[in-house]
Amino acid sequence: MPNQKTLRETKQHGAAWFPFNIYPCTIPQDFPQVALHWQDSMELVFVKKGRGIVQAGLTTYTAEAGDVYVFAPGVLHALRQLPGEVMEYENIIFDLELLGGAGDLCAEKYLLPLQSGRLALPMRLAPNDWGYTWAVNCLHAAEEFNKLKDVGYELCIKGELLLFLAALVGRSGDLPPADTPDTRRLKTVVQLVNEQYAGALHVTDAAAACGCSPCLLYTSPSPRDTERS
């Protein structure tokens, strides 16, 4: 099976003792796209202005101002320009270890399952969704605390992130696990394409790398557009 490490982002976000950071970004001014990848940290994309395309797992969305996209550890995701459009957004990235340690009930019940892909969160939070105002208020507060950096701001940010996750867990229902056989196959196929883009690549090669039959690979779900009603 191909090595999937090149799809994995390993950049350190924030200080080692406080792994949290916010990055303002604009597509296409800063870069035309963010290639398909995953990481061990939590990543939020908070769309501030304009529109763009966001892929989360096997689903693609038309992102609009106000949307929040939630990428748990291990979830494949990508961003790109919607033709003729500009999208301004904030990347909010943090390690789950920041929020709880060993022996902590919240870590055992929520954070560790989220880290390992056994607990899924909604990948998109839109303005009309239940809990949106609560969740977005937490992000606004975390942004402000991070900007001011007064004494104790780390405690405030940590608290707001926990409240944000609580808002998502409260509306998640019976979501499937974040990492499924389909997404694992997608990671393998994308890695294979990255490694062999200059040569011929056949469905049989991809199926062999995934450990499944060509028919199963061909009929697996493909990324699909989800339009806002």
Regions found by a protein language model. Give the residues of each.
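Conserved small/polar residues in nucleotide/adenosyl-binding loops
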Residues: 218-225
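Short, conserved beta-strand element in jelly-roll/cupin
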Residues: 37-53
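Tight coil/turn sites that cap or link beta-strands
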Residues: 30-31, 66, 74
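Conserved short histidine dyad/triad with adjacent acidic residue
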Residues: 22-38
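Short hydrophobic/aromatic patch on the recognition helix
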Residues: 66, 216-218
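Short, Lys/Arg-enriched, Trp-marked, Pro/Gly-tolerant hinge/linker segments that flank
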Residues: 121-132, 146-210, 224
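Short acidic-glycine-tyrosine-enriched beta hairpin
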Residues: 58-70
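A hydrophobic/aromatic-rich effector-binding and dimerization subdomain
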Residues: 2-25, 76, 80-144
